[in-house]
Amino acid sequence: MDDELLELQRQFEFAQQVKSSVRLSDRNVVELVQKLQELGVIDFDLLHTVTGKEYITQEQLRNEITREISKLGRVSVIDLADTIGVDLYHVEKQAQDVVLNDPGLMLVQGEIISQSYWDSIAEEINERLQECSQIAVAELAGQLQVGSELVQSVLEPRLGTLVKARLEGGQLYTPAYVERVTAMVRGASRGIFVPSNLSALWAPLQQLVQETNGASGVAVENSFFQSIFNRLLKEEEMLGSLRAGTHWTPSAFATAQKECVDSSFSQNSYISYESMQKLGISQAVQFLQSRYPDGTPLAAVFIHSSMIEMLDSATEDAIEQNSWIDSLSVLPSSFTSQDANKMLLLCPSVQSALKAEKALILGESYVLSSGFIKGIYDQIEKEADAFSIQASTATLIHPSSKSSESTESIPANTDKGSKKKKGKSASTKAATVETVPDDEEDARPKSKRNQKKGRDSSSSQKLDSKAGGKKESVKAQESNNIIPPDEWVMKKIVDSVPEFEDDGTENPDSILKHLADHMKPMLINSLKERRKKIFTENADRMRRLIDDLQKKLDESFLNMQLYEKALDLFEDDQSTAVVLHRHLLRTTAATIADTLLHGLDIHNKMKNGTEVEESKTQDLVLLDSSERTALAKNLNGSLSKKALALVEALEGKRVDTFMVTFRDLAEESGLVLKKLDKKLERTLLHSYRKDLISQVSTESDPIALLAKVVSLLFIKIHNKALQAPGRAIAAAISHLKEKLDESAYKTLTDYQTATVTLLALMSASSGEEHDCSADRILTKRELLESQMPLLRTLVLGDSQPQQS
C-alpha cells in the first residue's frame, strides 16, 4: 500500500514538472477567475496584489498581518501594505478586524501595538529606573513617539509587577526614592508650628531633592509632595488639620490659639475679629459661636452677655433722668457704631422704652429720652414759626418809601378836598402839576435809581453775572425760604444743649447732625400744618382782596382809557406824542400796573399759605422796574408770562401796547375791566372838569396853575382829558392856537414863557443867602401871580374861549 502511494506521488511530481505545450496568458487567467466567480465555483472574495499578478484571500491577508505583528510587536499599517503588497485600503480594513478580534492588540495613530511590545517596554523602563531612580512619562512618550496618556495608561496596570516603581504627577519613581522623599516631607511638616501654605513648603523640598540627586535629578512635581503628605496625614503620622487641600494648621498651634482666645474672652468679656485675624483664625464668627454658644456676634466683636447688661444699666439711667447717652462712650474703642446699635436693640430697658415711645435711637449709637427731645423741639418749633413768618414776609413789598418818593412832586395843596376826589383824580393831579422843563421831569426816576444803586448794588452784580442763565422759580425760592436750613436747626439745638457744640456741625456722625435730621421733618410738617391753617384763614381774605382790587382797577382803568383818547390829538406831532405816551405810562399806567401786580402777588402768597399782614393788602404801592419784574416772576405759569409782558410794555413808548397787555393780564387773573362807552366818558369828563375847575379856583401856586388851565381848555375845546408833562405844555398850547382868540392865546404864551423863565432862574440859583438871582426870582414870581387872575378868566371868567 505504501509503495502504491509512493508511486502515485512520483507520477504527480512528474506531471507537475512536465512543461505543457499550451500556456494560458495572464488575461486568460483573469477571465477564467471571473467566470468561476460568476458560476459560483469561487464563492469568496479575492484580493489582488498591487502588481496585479497574484490573488490573495481576505483570510490570508489577516494571517499575514497577524504574522507580522507577532514578529515585530509594533508595526505600522503603511509598512504592512508595503510588506504584503496589497493596497493600503484593504490592509487598513483587515487590520481593524484583527485588532477588534484580539484584545491584546491596539491601533494607535496608524500603528498596531501588541501587549508583548508593552511588556518589553516595561522591562526596559524598569532597567532604566534602577539606574536613575525616576523617569518622566513625557520623556518616555517622546522616545516611543506616542502620547503621554497612552504611556501612562499602559504603565499603570504594570506598576508593582513588571515596573517596580510609583507613578506620581507624570513621573515614575522607585520605591527607595519614594521612601527618601517621604522622609523629607515628614520631617519638614513636623517642623512647622504655625499655619502655613503647603505650596510654600514644597519649593525648598524640590531644591533639596535636586541637590541630593545631582545634575541627573529631575524636578519633582508639587502633586507628588502633596500626595505623600496626604498619605502621612491619613496614617496619623502628623497631627493637625488640612483646609482647602493646602492650608496646614498644626495641632500645637490650634491648641495655643484656643488658649489665647479663652484667656482674652474671659478677661474682657469680648474679643474683636481683628485680634482673631491676628491669631490666624479667618472664620472668627463660626469659631467663636461653636466655642461660646451663649455669646453674641456683632459687626466687629464677639461679646459676652455681661456686656449687654452693663450697657443696659447705663442707658436705663439716662432714660429715667430724661437725658441722653452715647453708647460708644461706655464701650471699648474696638466697638463700632453698628456694634453699639445691635447691643442697644438687645438691651431690655431700651426695648421697653422704644415700645413705650419713651426713648429714641439716633445715629445707631445715641439713645435720647423722648422728654429730652421734646424739650428741645418745643423751643425750636416756636423759633421756627417766627423764622417762617419772617422769611415769608421778607419778600413782600414795603411801599412806604416808594410812595413818598413818587409823590414828591405833588404840591401840598393837592391834599385838600375829599378822599373821593383824591381817588378820582389822583393821576390827573400828578400830571397837571408837572410844569417843569425836561431836567426836572426826570428828577424823580433818577433819584430813585440813585437811591437803589447803593442799596442793591451787590444783588445787581449777581444778576449781571448770571445773565442768560437758568433762573430758579420764585415760588420754589419762597417755599424753601420758609423752611429753616439744617445749619439754623443745629444752631438752635446747640443753644438749647451747649454740650453738643463739642461734636461740631461738620461731623456727619455727630449727635447734633442726627438730632437735626430727626427734627427737620417734624419742623417741616409743623410748618406745613401752619401754612394749611393760614391758607384756610386766607380764603375769605383772598375773596375780599380780589373784590377790592376789582374796585380799584374799575375806576383807574376807565380814567386810563379816558386819558388815552386825548393822545389821538397829537398823532401828527410824533415828538410830542412820544413825550405824552411816556408821561402817561410813567404816571397813571404805572399806578394801575403796580396796583394789579401787587394785588396778584399778595393773592399768590395767600394762596400758597403765606401769612400776610392786613395792612399790606391795603397800601398803595409804587414800584420800580426791577421790583415789577420780581413780582411778575413770582406768579405762576401763563400769569407770570403775561405779567412780564405788562412790565415790558410799561417800559415801552406806546400806551396802546400797554392797554393790550394790561387787559390780557387782568383777563388771565379773572378780573373784568369795564370798557369806556360814551355815557361813562361823559360822566368822567364832567367829573374831571368839575375837579379841575375847583383846583383852578383854589390854586395858589402860579407854576402849577398853568398845567391845570391848559387841561381844562382841552376839555372845553376838544372834549378830551389831556395829561401833559411840563415839557409838553408848550406843544399843547400851540395845539390850542387855532381854537382860541389872539388875546387868550397871547395870555397863555406869555404866562408859559414867564413860567419857563422862573423855573430856569430857580434851577440856576445857588440857594445862598446873598445870591443876586433871588431878587429876580421874586420879581418873576410876583409877575406871574399878578397874571393868575387873567389866566383864570380863560376858563372861569365870563369871556369863555370860542369853540369852532
Curated annotation (Swiss-Prot):
- Spans of biased composition, class Basic and acidic residues? 463-475
Pfam families documented for this protein: E3_UFM1_ligase, UFL1, UFL1_C
The UniProt record lists the EC number as 2.3.2.-
Q: Which UniProt keywords apply?
A: Acetylation, Transferase, Ubl conjugation pathway
Q: Which residues carry this modification: N-acetylmethionine?
A: 1
- Which leading EC class covers this enzyme? transferase
Segment Disordered: which positions? 397-483
User: Which Gene Ontology molecular function entries are recorded, alphabetically?
Assistant: UFM1 ligase activity
Give a GO biological-process term: protein ufmylation
Record carries keyword Disulfide bond: no
Listed Low complexity bias regions: 400-409
Q: Where are the transmembrane segments?
A: none
Q: Which domain of life is it from?
A: Eukaryota
Q: Which family does it belong to?
A: Belongs to the UFL1 family.
**PANTHER family membership:** E3 UFM1-PROTEIN LIGASE 1
Which purpose does this protein serve, as stated in its record?
Answer: E3 UFM1-protein ligase that mediates ufmylation of target proteins.
What's the name of the protein?
E3 UFM1-protein ligase 1 homolog
**Organism source for this protein?**
Arabidopsis thaliana
